[in-house]
Amino acid sequence: MAIDENKQKALAAALGQIEKQFGKGSIMRLGEDRSMNVETISTGSLSLDVALGAGGLPRGRIVEIYGPESYGKTTLTLQVIAAAQREGKICAFIDAEHALDPIYAQKLGVDIDNLLCSQPDTGEQALEICDALSRSGAVDVIVVDSVAALTPKAEIEGEIGDSHVGLAARMMSQAMRKLAGNLKNSNTLLIFINQIRMKIGVMFGNPETTTGGNALKFYASVRLDIRRIGSVKNGDEVVGSETRVKVVKNKIAAPFKQAEFQIMYGEGINTFGELIDLGVKHKLVEKAGAWYSYNGEKIGQGKANATTYLKEHPEMYNELNTKLREMLLNHAGEFTSARDFC
């Protein structure tokens, strides 16, 4: 349907005035190509990058990672930081739980000498630090661990047992309104780790809920639910956990996809074993009985031996990793248009 010429002129003048006053890109037509493709940062897990659809976690957005205790939430965020630092990006970790282990972080590949770290006293202080870092435009990734530990100042200064109904939820709601625009302007990825609580008196449906109210659920572009589905054993010794991550919400690609990988204690995500599994699934690695072969060369009997072989042959690992990424992520931007998933 044709638009009246006078209306077109008036609209063009209004758009020009808006862009002049608020900056280029402050308003645009939804079908335009500019600013539609979302830049991402790898999670450190190829299968999770594929499940996210865009090849990783989106920059300029809010991401929530939640799950039960000791299921790998902090490990996953540290792997994201390590992956970002390998690309020369600046990262910050807001340790509201005061529980970050720098030795463990270093084992996961985090450059602790260049990692910004804060252990705030109150929830307001933590969120103000996030806002200041994002407005600087110099920080690429910010992790907050965790929402449940963001204690409002009034609660800290009050007595134990005082009622503070909805205080944390109001604090988070106000912070989300303030942070969302700044993150978009600075292209900063903000990851919130969250814990699970049980709703009392729920007879039907899922009784689980996350802390901090509903604001984070609405403002998050991606929500990841992380669960342990089994144990990794070396003989009788448990050396890791089988982990499943479900993409519960995704504004940049199709949601509800899942990724499964191993988290090894003291080592993080087993990327070598993950490549073996993906290689077999996509017929780049041959499996005959218990033997694994790549390009006609036997690389091990059993997954553990094949994984060890990949660790000892980085050139083979890099070749297989490159092939799988080209195969699985070549359409990563297919659904990154805002008109597809809002």
From Swiss-Prot:
Pfam families: RecA, RecA_C. The keyword ATP-binding applies. CDD domains: RecA. GO terms for biological process: DNA recombination; DNA repair; SOS response. GO terms for molecular function: ATP binding; ATP hydrolysis activity; ATP-dependent DNA damage sensor activity; damaged DNA binding; single-stranded DNA binding. Keywords: ATP-binding, Cytoplasm, DNA damage, DNA recombination, DNA repair, DNA-binding, Nucleotide-binding, SOS response. The keyword DNA-binding applies. PROSITE patterns: RECA_1, RECA_2, RECA_3. It is found in: Cytoplasm. GO terms for cellular component: cytosol. Belongs to the RecA family. Can catalyze the hydrolysis of ATP in the presence of single-stranded DNA, the ATP-dependent uptake of single-stranded DNA by duplex DNA, and the ATP-dependent hybridization of homologous single-stranded DNAs. It interacts with LexA causing its activation and leading to its autocatalytic cleavage. HAMAP family: RecA. This is Protein RecA. It comes from Pectobacterium carotovorum. The lineage of its organism: Bacteria, Pseudomonadati, Pseudomonadota, Gammaproteobacteria, Enterobacterales. The gene is recA.
